[in-house]
């Protein structure tokens, strides 16, 4: 595959044991494990013809993920440090990377006198997972705090969605 020859800061591992990446410490190998350090690396990886039409699982903190001992016959994408950030925007809102731990978002909001994120302090996992599952507790959930999200499709296309366009559970 050409992707293995491309210069990337990301890592591609074959038959990587998944027990190392979830809280249950269970799971056999992933056929391909891709630790992504940039959007451009993910795009290159997804554009490679050898990676098309394969099952893909995007892994966050692994707090709500259970892999079979038989492994995963597909691609596991683990977002790296570039995707773990929280920053204050000029309009008073915050931008959060998908790999950012929920607790870090709650702490950042508290430090910046923003309310409505307190519930995240007791939810394990990342914001990416919180959005997918509409995580919440104590009468709050993440859908009440989102203005918009930006995603990368499995075809490598960046897409933005306003919160009212998202069908939360």
Short names for language-model regions:
Residues 3-127:
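Anion-binding (especially nucleotide phosphate/pyrophosphate-binding) glycine-rich loop
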Residues 34-39, 66-84, 132-162:
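Structural signature of FAD isoalloxazine-binding scaffolds in flavoprotein oxidoreductases
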């Amino acid at each position: 595959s050409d992707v293995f020859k491309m210069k990337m800061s990301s890592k591609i591992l074959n038959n990587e044991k998944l027990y190392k990446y979830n809280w249950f410490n269970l799971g056999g190998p992933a056929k391909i494990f891709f630790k992504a350090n940039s959007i451009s690396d993910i795009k290159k990886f997804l554009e490679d013809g050898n990676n098309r039409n394969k099952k893909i699982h995007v892994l966050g903190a692994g707090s709500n993920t259970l892999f079979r001992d038989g492994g995963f016959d597909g691609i596991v994408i683990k977002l790296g440090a570039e995707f773990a950030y929280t920053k204050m925007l000029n309009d008073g809102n915050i931008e959060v990377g998908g790999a950012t731990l929920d607790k870090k978002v709650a702490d950042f909001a508290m430090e910046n006198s923003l309310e409505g994120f307190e519930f995240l302090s007791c939810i394990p996992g990342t914001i990416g997972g919180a959005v997918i599952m509409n995580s919440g507790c104590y009468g709050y959930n993440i859908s009440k705090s989102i203005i918009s999200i930006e995603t990368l499709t499995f075809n490598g296309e960046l897409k933005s969605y306003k919160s009212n366009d998202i069908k939360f559970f």
